[in-house]
Amino acid sequence: MSIEIRNITKSFGSFQALKGIDLTIGSGELVALLGPSGCGKTTLLRIIAGLEAADSGQILLHGEDTTHRHVRERRVGFVFQHYALFRHMSVFENIAFGLRVRPRGQRPPEAEIRRRVQELLELVQLDWLADRHPGQLSGGQRQRIALARALAVEPKVLLLDEPFGALDAKVRKDLRRWLRRLHDGLHITSVFVTHDQEEALEVADRVVVLNAGQIEQVGSADEVYDHPATPFVCQFIGDVNLFHGRVHGGRALIGETVIELPDIAESDTEKALFFARPHEIEIGRGTGIGAVVRAIRRRGNAVRVELERKDGRGAVEAELSREAFGRHAIKHGDEVVIQPSKIRMFQP
């Protein structure tokens, strides 16, 4: 089922949570709403579900206007960050709940409910926990049960609000990969909210980056990471270094340093913002931006080097492989020069 969001606005008092959101999500697509706290991503998800009313605009599900339809009429499954499982019910009863509370004319026979619940328990690989209660489960197991409960009513759209936010890092990583595999098998249109860039880039078909109630960019993981549309996207997704400078003759001028811009067809400008990721910063002793090594931090197979520019214009972070770090023989307090091997340019 496709989702079409047309010029959705929403305010809470004087605060504008959403400012004219337009977005189309294809049938069977898995889309991440990514952004910082307060950007409007959860509000948008709740409006799609029918849990929140928009001030203006339309929500179309499979071409039908559902803007004013009750949540029960939208055939939407919702998974909350904190599971929202019924503690007094067993796992089996939690999953069956949505089917058993349907009006009598829409309620499946009990045998069909039991068959459906058993299928879902096997789907989420927790059939051996059917008689347990939520308090006896781990966080990861609870979230799988919450997902099974959402799927029990056979929704046309699955919405997930920070589904892994309450879990530790290792469980989060395992569960998001499991969710991707599950989605590939079910092909149900899914939208999930997250503030975790790595999570969005790894799981989603497309990422919608929101900021201050507006969409900054929509694209694949590669598009938003390698080709950010705005300075906000560039700074929000992944680590990045910011340099202030200007453009002249197809070159970036950062202080006294000149960097060729072969991929940027920009006219001369007196003010420009240049961004380079830590792994795009080269460290040497020739020409470049003078800097002093202030800290060295080893992170698995990589080494992060924190540097302070000698011209007083801020700090720079570089990332080297352990092999490259060993060749440079860098130590704390060394005076070096840095040179971005690749930069992205924006006009302020």
Swiss-Prot record:
Signal sequence, renumbered to the chain: none
Broad class of enzyme this protein falls into: translocase
Lineage: superkingdom: Bacteria
CDD domains associated with the record: ABC_CysA_sulfate_importer
Record keywords, A-Z: ATP-binding, Cell inner membrane, Cell membrane, Membrane, Nucleotide-binding, Sulfate transport, Translocase, Transport
Record-linked PROSITE patterns: ABC_TRANSPORTER_1, ABC_TRANSPORTER_2, CYSA
Catalytic reaction annotation: sulfate(out) + ATP + H2O = sulfate(in) + ADP + phosphate + H(+); thiosulfate(out) + ATP + H2O = thiosulfate(in) + ADP + phosphate + H(+)
EC number: 7.3.2.3
Binding site residues for ATP: 35-42
Subcellular location: Cell inner membrane
Residue intervals of the ABC transporter domain: 3-237
Pfam families: ABC_tran, CysA_C_terminal, TOBE_3
Transmembrane segments: none
Role noted for this protein: Part of the ABC transporter complex CysAWTP involved in sulfate/thiosulfate import. Responsible for energy coupling to the transport system.
Known partners and oligomeric status: The complex is composed of two ATP-binding proteins (CysA), two transmembrane proteins (CysT and CysW) and a solute-binding protein (CysP).
UniProt record similarity statement: Belongs to the ABC transporter superfamily. Sulfate/tungstate importer (TC 3.A.1.6) family.
Record protein name field: Sulfate/thiosulfate import ATP-binding protein CysA
Organism: Methylococcus capsulatus (strain ATCC 33009 / NCIMB 11132 / Bath)
Gene name tied to this protein: cysA
